[in-house]
């Protein structure tokens, strides 16, 4: 969690973890407030190393606690991320930590034998003082940061209208929803990796692929691929179609998951793009 001690974020995370523990899991909670996390300095050492098939680590490994936490995180079967919402999106501490994940890109580390193969499950909890209107990019930003470590997000929850520290304790339904997060994570862990699926509300969000609530008008992508409408999180492409009851839904095109960011194959296309556009610079 990136929340304060005994904050709404930490309280909801504890409730979810308690359910996991009750169902037989070994759990550990890490609060980023207890650690020193430095901003990425943009040295590109990790990306240059990966382009040559070498693991260089992060140039800041010895400067802060990021690696210490990642050594634990990448050795887990599941992680539940919980963060407060500031200015529509997750807190800067959460983003600062997660934006350093490229140096620990799990598909690459697995490929070169630096870490053991692991099918990771993930879930998200965002907490804010208002409705979705003032948390509109919270879960979406959180989910986008989980791609690098190949987390299969099976559920996510936005706790709304709890602006005061610990206020979430006044709402039994919010506590119950956090506990449901823990239950769904355990259900996913007890399911074969190839059969794991979204376990939250099936109608949650606009995107049927990642369940984000964020779409945008499509623009030409690398090598000319274009869709009328795109999911801003997973990159699914398609269009809006009117349903028989007069509402709208996002329908993914036949080739709409060619560059699905939730898959290692889809992210691989992006790596190819960066390599080509960077050229010999």
Label each PLM-derived region with a short phrase.
Residues 84, 127-133, 168-170:
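Flexible, glycine/proline-enriched loop segments at strand-loop-helix junctions
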Residues 1-83, 88-103, 176, 185-186, ...:
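N-terminal beta1-alpha1-beta2 submodule of the flavodoxin-like/Rossmannoid cofactor-binding fold
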Residues 7, 136, 166-172:
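Short, solvent-exposed loop/turn segments at secondary-structure boundaries
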Residues 31, 157-158:
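Residue-level recognition of beta-strand->loop/alpha-helix junctions
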Residues 161-164:
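Active-site rim beta-loop-alpha module in soluble metabolic enzymes
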Residues 92-93, 108-157:
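Short, glycine-/small-residue-rich phosphate/pyrophosphate-handling segment
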